[in-house]
A protein has these predicted regions:
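Short acidic DE-rich linear segments
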Residues: 1-4, 307-312
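Charged, compositionally biased N-terminal leader segments and the immediate start
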Residues: 1-25
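Residue-level signature of catalytic and energy-coupling elements of molecular machines
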Residues: 11, 48-50, 109, 139, ...
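Short amphipathic alpha-helical/adjacent loop interface patches that line ligand
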Residues: 11, 15, 122, 206, ...
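Primarily NTPase-proximal linker/entry elements flanking Walker-type ATP/GTP-binding cores
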Residues: 17-138, 145-166, 173-181, 185-190
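Short hydrophobic/aromatic residue motifs in ordered secondary structure
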Residues: 51-53, 142, 258, 286
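Conserved catalytic-core segment of NTP-binding enzymes
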Residues: 148, 168-183, 197-303
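Short glycine-rich anion-binding loops that position phosphate/pyrophosphate groups of nucleotides
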Residues: 193-195
Length: 312
């Protein structure tokens, strides 16, 4: 099964949650008026699209309806789909780190699939013939994280730099940077601790890591990706808010998109924070993590044919 098919299947619950509601609004009104827009607004917000994104999407839709002189609600559906796609467009430089010597930090609470995402991202980059090192792990307080990364190293062929459980995370990064330079690696992927309970400690830890990178590899391109579990819905927004206070988040990996009713969160996040979703995960295999593409995502959500992308 191609990635688009998997994504479409994975978004079934989200589709039932959002799209069936949208369709009933379109079919339940005979004219486009304030009541129509109010009903559509409520449906989008209830579907985890979020208040900010919903307002922006509806403002855009109203303009398009006016420009195109549309009277029939059923004719709005494609315009709504187009508005959502535009809202989620990443722009030109979303994956600039692939073209540079880079350090990519993966950040997030424990249990969201952070270490697995490091492994899958390593697999994606290895498939582009990049030389990849995984810092295994800056999350040195969780022995299982090191075992997991070792397993991913075996599966993907990416190198791993590991120290014993309880080592200083900044020291792990220091060793990993030295290995990066010696082995002429393209990308260093860093797993980080997921403890938000004590924000002060986490901030200090991330600052220490930043200082090491700044001192040892200042010309490296930096990317800080937060890993969020799509099944947590609005809770994912809270996590992003908390971590964004601690460090500069540049992108999002949205995991567990297969089987969640809360996939609308992908739209909400980008509108509310202006931080792009860069990867989405729909399963356990390496190829089940893919670059985010707004057309592919929205087509899968609305069950629209994705043309030649069917087996991406």
């Amino acid at each position: 099964m191609g990635f688009f098919s998997k994504l479409k299947e994975g978004l079934t619950k989200t589709r039932d949650n959002i799209v069936s509601g949208i369709d009933s609004v379109f079919s339940g009104f005979s004219s486009i008026d304030d009541d129509f827009y109010d009903e559509l607004e409520e449906t989008l917000i209830m579907g985890d699209i979020g208040v900010v994104a919903t307002e922006e999407i509806l403002d855009d839709l109203k303009n398009k309806v006016k420009e195109n002189k549309i009277k029939n609600p059923a004719d709005c559906k494609q315009l709504l789909i187009d508005s959502i796609k535009e809202k989620m467009n990443l722009g030109e430089n979303a994956y600039e780190f692939e073209n540079r010597k880079s350090i990519v930090m993966l950040i997030g609470v424990n249990g969201v699939g952070k270490t697995t995402s490091v492994g899958k991202l390593a697999g994606l980059l290895k498939a582009q013939n990049k030389k990849v090192i995984m810092a295994g792990a800056a999350d040195t307080f969780r022995a299982a994280a090191i075992e997991q990364l070792t397993e991913w190293s075996n599966r993907t062929g990416a190198d791993i730099i590991a120290q014993s459980e309880g080592s200083d995370p900044a020291a792990v990064i220091y060793d990993s940077i030295a290995a990066c330079k010696a082995r002429k690696a393209d990308v260093l992927l860093c797993d980080t601790a997921g403890r938000l309970q004590n924000k002060k400690n986490l901030m200090e830890e991330l600052r220490k890591i930043d200082r090491v990178i700044e001192r040892e590899y200042s010309d490296a391109y930096r990317e800080n990706l937060i890993v969020l579990d799509a099944t947590t819905g609005q809770n994912a927004l809270s996590q992003l808010r908390e971590f964004n206070d601690v460090t500069n988040i540049t992108g999002i990996i949205l995991t567990k998109m297969d089987g969640t009713a809360k996939g609308g969160i992908a739209v909400a996040i980008q509108a509310e924070f202006g931080i792009p979703v860069k990867y989405i995960g729909v399963g356990e295999k390496v190829e089940d993590l893919q670059k985010f593409d707004s057309d592919t995502f929205v087509n899968a959500l609305f069950d629209v044919d994705n043309g030649s992308d069917e087996d991406r």
